[in-house]
Swiss-Prot record:
Compositionally skewed regions (Polar residues) per UniProt: 83-93, 141-166, 279-294, 426-435, 456-465, 478-499, 863-872
Stored PANTHER family: LIM DOMAIN-CONTAINING PROTEIN A-RELATED, PAXILLIN-RELATED
Region Disordered: start-end pairs: 56-192, 207-242, 255-294, 364-412, 426-445, 450-622, 632-651, 690-807, 829-848, 857-957
Presence of the UniProt keyword Transmembrane helix in the record: no
Record key words, sorted: LIM domain, Metal-binding, Repeat, Zinc
Gene Ontology MF annotations: metal ion binding
Ranges of compositional bias, category Basic and acidic residues: 519-535, 690-702
UniProt keyword annotation of Repeat present: yes
Protein name, UniProt field: LIM domain-containing protein A
TM spans (from-to): none
InterPro entries xrefs: Znf_LIM
């Protein structure tokens, strides 16, 4: 079998090296890197051989190729759960450099001789007391981090450190005074948290007050133990200047309070219970917050050092918190936690996740210049601001720039309120956020809208973070940079207990920087005035006058109860019902819309503080995508003969009030010119209110610049009349009024004609009890589509425009022509199914086109495919009617709950012929049937008479709409390939192009000649199996040979062809030699030897040469004179005869006489070697 060397890709004959599943020549098995011979040891990398030196070298991309650095000793952090149960092993912090105490801005001037002015209380843990009267800046406070400094290198001298630590903090096991000699220096701002009971555990935590002002309290007598009380009580009436001090809060586990623990509920004016007998330092405050039923979190026994003296982290912040706490606070957001206890300088540590999450609060501490002129020095500690303390409310106004939330009586101290981190660089320096602001409040279902969801504000004037963001007043509860719009950073504010004040929800909508706010009535309702939306979702067939509940409410209406609201609602319903009946008798039609869902409100406020300043509005646009679904709305379409000159002025000044809408549809606002625009569908409510105030719709001037168009139907002989001269039909004259309004645009006066908005609501959703509604989408310029009207035959109806501006009645998503601003509003309409069918078959192959002449552009609407019902109806009415010239419109309304409305689309193109519409609409007979009952439908059927057909035939070809240019046809070039005239051996198909011929002269497609094992196309040399004629690629051949190796070893190989024997082969075995039957041949004539007629010449122990007897006796081969065997290899010629090299021997000693060795021929004519001759001659001489 053939083997291929992996390295040189040549055939391996003889000895091979088989490694990694590949064969190698002995000289080809070398190192891949250095090409050295691998005779003894080799190493494998990715099935490639390497020598030992190259194997140990680092290689690119090797994951083990990592530079080994010298390990340095370091302190390994220890988990808090592994800390000692008691303080036998206290932390020995490392010393820090000099800590400057120049931040102490206020000092206490004590006039007593016994006062000890310790401006720099740099106490050392190794000293029991520190009564220093000078500035000892070199003996600096150690810089230690309780979260990372626990290590084996720091746990030394545990007993002495424990004693020194307790004595320096004024904690003694057997009682006594706190800090020694009344100095009260101790370790400032070092806090211990202990579990009261048998298993005590204390964790030292450092409270940071970096770069803040501290009080230098000078204790002058033993009465100082009772003077350092917590200023969270009502005992402190000092009006103090707020100073920024940081404190930290970590979540704590649930621990029940033990007996004897010192408790300060943060509400009662509890005096410090620590005196000279309690072992608590006299300048510290003790806290243990009461558990809350909601959060069930209890503060453990806490000893908090006052802010007196040096802070261990004043000079430099520890590594776990970064370089500076100010940088951390400015980049962090407070995450509200319901189970976090609030108190003054309290750490709550959660045992299951130690040190997982730290909340840093910036407290406003108070610092005073206290002039103590008596022996009893009243040291006023920093007033640690308590957010939940109701009794400290008088100081809250002066101690905080932002008014903190009042959660009611201080009953639940463990409930956390969403409090933002406010940073003030100076005292009483209120933060001024940037101007741009956007507020978006959700009103899905009946959830209360909360200002914490999304609130950006301007010009922070309010001190209450619980107040909502009011765009008009520029109030905000959190600082924001200019033009910042990150809606994901804010989370909903959780409800804080029963005593939490109800959140005032405000939704604002602005178009010209003018806003109105609508407060929320209670938690059960959405925005006030939207109580009817739930009724709309449940009863879609309620009376259309229910939508009048969307009237505008100011902030005073939030206090109305439900009965008042229902009473007013019924009164409005009766009033609107009377007005509707009156208007219906006058021929005015009220079309009703009903859509429902849940939603959101969008508020956009420009950078313009002055609404009259239009220059800033060009800076950039805003693109918002907000889901909307609108509640029930009534759009009153009315006729207005003349435009009011002040309509545009009122449109620019209109104020839109959005009372909160439900999500369910998409609103996309794009404004390339930079003008902020809000698409407010609720503006239609203002139109309704103004419309009902005017009984006569023809004399009504809508403040939203309503465009009204009159369509009167006149005699069929008259063509489509001029807008200024409508014709009335003598037989049946009917006027159909449509009032079209342009909702919500914020347009600059000089750009008002170019920047116009349009809103298309399609399909109409109405119940059988409602009037059918057509809402019209129009932008400058406008176009009108008659396809919305359904016509019945034998009725004369003509359309006349009263204004040059026309309206396009198209049930499409939104169609703007030549409008720089496009606004697309799509609605998911529930509880309704509205189907529109428009068919416009024409007289010829071209569809009937209805065109309206207008001053700017011409828009034509085309409808296709007449139904069978229309054809039958027309045939029944007039036998001579040509079906191609008829037009059928049908509006089908179905109240199918749970189905979405089916949308129909119309085809619009522009024509240049102004007379086409007049010619097309000549002698058309129309009729309007208005049903004011449960179902209102418009059925318009165009009935054509013979005169109309003649006029239609006289229409010139030039008046037809321009045909679209023919599409360019691209053809693919096909190249014909001549057939080879042969078929593929595999697929039996004719071969075109390249042809592959194998060793048997068989033809294949190149893609059909594949390996029988891996089925890959063979382009390289291949191998065959003779028994089955299968084709194998080189790789598969090697694999198959390796798999068959054990079997080949058992059968052996042929000594002639060196191929392995198989079970199917006929084998000839001679001694140890095996041959194929066809391989056992004569070496002279190369014929297969049959039977035993052969002569053998053995070359080695495993190979021999054979010759048939025919060649042997014919003289074609030499015969040995000694053995009479055939000579096929090397022979020796001596004494005229041929000998095998091994057969020419000495006749005396029988030693082989080699080539070129002297010998002698004796008398018997046999060879004698030289040694035998010499021996015989010596013996003869001795005789």
């Amino acid at each position: 079998m053939l083997f291929i060397c992996r390295k040189c890709n040549t055939r391996v004959e003889g000895e091979t090296i088989f490694v990694f599943g590949y064969h190698y020549h002995p000289n080809c098995f070398v190192c891949v890197s250095c090409n050295c011979s691998l005779s003894d040891v080799y190493f494998e990398i990715d099935k490639l051989p390497y020598c030992e030196l190259d194997y140990k070298k680092p290689r690119p991309g090797d994951p083990t190729n990592v530079p080994v650095l010298k390990k340095k000793p370091f302190s390994k952090p220890v988990d808090a759960s592994n800390l000692p149960r008691t303080w036998n092993n206290s932390v020995k912090p490392t010393n820090n450099n000099n800590i400057n105490n120049n931040n102490s801005n206020n000092s206490n001037n004590n006039n007593n001789n016994n006062n000890n002015n310790n401006n720099n209380n740099n106490s050392n843990l190794n000293n029991t007391t520190n009564n220093s009267n000078n500035n000892n800046n070199n003996n600096s406070k150690p810089n230690y981090n309780p979260l990372t400094s626990f290590g084996s290198n720091n746990l030394k001298k545990s007993t002495s450190v424990e004693n020194n630590l307790k004595s320096s903090n004024g904690i003694s096991s057997g009682g006594g005074s706190g800090s020694g000699s009344g100095s009260g220096s101790g370790n400032p701002e070092l806090m211990y948290m202990e579990k009261n009971g048998a298993d005590q555990q204390s964790i030292p935590v450092v409270l940071d007050s970096t770069n803040k002002n501290n009080n230098n309290n000078n204790n002058n007598s033993n009465n100082n133990n009772n003077s350092n009380n917590n200023n969270n009580s009502n005992d402190s009436d000092n009006k103090q200047t707020p100073v920024n001090v940081y404190s930290a809060s970590i979540e704590n586990q649930i621990i029940e309070p033990k007996h004897g623990s010192l408790i300060n509920d943060g509400n009662n004016s509890t005096k410090s219970k620590s005196n000279s007998n309690t072992g608590v330092p006299n300048n510290s405050t003790q806290y243990n917050a009461t558990p809350s039923p909601s959060s069930e979190v209890v503060n453990q026994f806490v000893v908090v050092e006052s802010d007196k003296g040096q802070n261990p982290t004043n000079a430099k912040r520890s590594n776990s918190f970064g370089d500076s706490l100010d940088d951390i606070i400015s980049s962090m957001e407070m995450i509200p936690k319901n189970n976090v206890s609030t108190g003054s300088n309290v750490f709550n540590i959660q045992d299951d996740e130690k040190f997982k999450e730290i909340q840093l609060k910036k407290h406003n501490e108070n610092n005073n210049n206290n002039n103590n002129n008596n022996n009893n020095n009243n040291n006023n500690n920093n007033n640690n601001y308590n957010y939940n303390n109701n009794n400290n409310g008088e100081n809250n106004q002066n101690n905080s720039n932002k008014k903190q939330p009042h959660i009611g009586g201080g009953e639940n101290l463990d409930e956390q309120v969403d409090i933002k981190i406010n940073k003030c660089n100076e005292v009483n320096d209120s933060y001024q956020p940037s101007k741009p602001s956007v507020a978006i409040y959700s009103s899905n279902n009946n959830n209360n809208l909360k200002p914490g969801n999304i609130a950006y504000g301007n010009n922070s004037q309010s001190s209450d973070p619980s107040e909502p963001v009011v765009i008009g007043d520029h109030r905000s509860n959190s600082p924001r940079t200019k033009s910042q719009l990150d809606l994901n950073q804010y989370q909903p504010t959780p409800n804080v207990g029963k005593s939490t004040q109800p959140t005032t929800t405000t939704t604002t909508t602005t178009t010209t920087s003018t806003t109105k706010t609508l407060p929320n009535k209670d938690n059960d309702n959405h925005l006030h005035g939207h109580d009817h939306q739930n009724d709309d979702n449940n009863n879609s067939s309620s009376d259309s006058s229910d939508s009048e509940d969307d009237s505008v409410h100011d902030s005073s209406s939030s206090s109305e109860d439900e009965s008042d609201h229902e009473r007013k609602r019924k009164a409005r319903k009766e009033k609107k019902k009377q007005q509707k009946q009156l208007k219906h008798r006058q021929g005015h039609h009220i079309h009703n819309h009903e859509v429902g869902g849940g939603g959101a409100a969008v508020v956009i406020d420009n950078d313009n503080e002055n609404p009259d300043d239009k220059s800033k509005s060009k800076k950039g646009g805003l693109h918002l995508d907000v889901d909307f679904t609108f509640g029930k709305k009534e759009h009153h379409h009315q006729q207005q003969k003349e435009h009011d000159d002040d309509a545009e002025e009122e449109q620019a000044k209109v104020k839109y009030v959005d009372k909160g809408v439900q999500a369910g549809s998409d609103l996309s606002i794009s404004n390339p010119s930079g003008t902020m625009i809000v698409e407010d569908i609720h503006t239609a409510k203002l139109k309704e209110n103004d419309h009902h105030a005017h009984p006569n719709p023809l004399e009504h001037s809508h403040p939203h610049q309503s465009h009204s168009h009159s369509h009167s139907h006149s005699h069929p002989q008259h063509p489509h009349s001029h807008p200024q001269h409508p014709h009335s039909h003598p037989h049946q004259s009917h006027s159909h009024s449509h009032a079209h309004s342009q909702p919500t645009t914020t347009v600059q006066p000089q750009q008002q004609q170019q920047h116009s908005l349009s809103t298309v609501v399609h399909p109409h959703n109405a119940t059988p009890s409602h009037h059918h509604h057509h809402q019209h989408s129009h932008s400058q310029p406008h176009s009108f589509d008659h396809n919305q009207h359904q016509h019945q035959p034998l009725q004369h109806h003509h359309h006349t425009h009263s204004q040059p501006i026309s309206i396009q009645h198209q049930h499409i998503e939104n169609k703007h022509i030549d409008s720089p601003i496009q606004h697309h509003v799509s609605h998911n309409i529930k509880n309704s199914h509205h189907q529109h069918q428009h068919q416009h078959p024409s007289h010829s192959d071209e569809p009937i086109v209805q065109q309206h002449v207008q001053e700017t552009t011409k828009t034509t609407t085309t409808q296709y495919k007449p139904p069978q019902s229309s054809i039958q109806n027309n045939n029944n009415n007039n036998n001579n009617l040509i079906i191609e010239d008829s037009t059928h419109h049908s509006h089908n309304l179905h109240n199918n709950n749970g189905r979405d409305g089916i949308k129909s689309y119309s085809k619009t193109f522009i024509t240049d012929d102004p007379n086409y519409h007049q010619n097309q609409n000549q002698n058309q007979h129309h009729s309007h049937q208005h049903h004011s009952h449960q179902h209102h439908s418009h059925q318009h059927h165009h009935h054509q008479h013979q005169p109309y057909q003649q006029q239609q035939q006289q229409i010139k070809v030039d008046s037809l709409p321009p045909q679209r240019p023919k599409e360019k046809v691209y053809t693919q070039t096909i190249t014909t390939i001549v057939s080879s005239g042969k078929n593929c051996k595999r697929c039996k198909l004719e071969i075109f192009g390249n042809t592959l011929i194998n060793h048997l002269q068989e033809t294949y497609h190149p893609e059909c000649f594949k390996c029988s094992n891996c089925f890959s196309s063979i382009v390289d040399p291949y191998f065959t199996e003779p028994s089955t004629n299968k084709i194998f690629c080189a790789k598969c051949q090697i694999v198959l040979n390796d798999l068959a190796k054990p079997k080949r070893d058992s059968l052996g190989f042929c000594c002639s062809c060196y191929k392995f024997l198989t079970e199917e082969d006929d084998i000839i075995v001679i001694d140890k030699e095996k041959y194929h039957n066809k391989c056992f041949k004569c070496s002279s004539c190369k014929e297969v030897i049959r039977g035993n007629n052969f002569s053998r010449e053995q070359m080695t122990s495993t190979s021999s040469n054979y010759c048939c007897n025919t060649c042997l006796h014919s003289g074609r081969v030499d015969k040995c004179a000694y053995c009479h065997g055939v000579i096929l290899g090397v022979s020796m010629l001596a004494m005229g005869q041929n000998y095998h090299p091994k057969c020419f021997k000495c006749s005396t000693c029988h030693v082989v006489i080699r080539h070129n060795t002297p010998f002698t021929i004796n008398k018997n004519q046999t060879p004698t070697c030289q040694n035998c001759i010499n021996t015989s001659s010596v013996g003869v001489a001795s005789r």
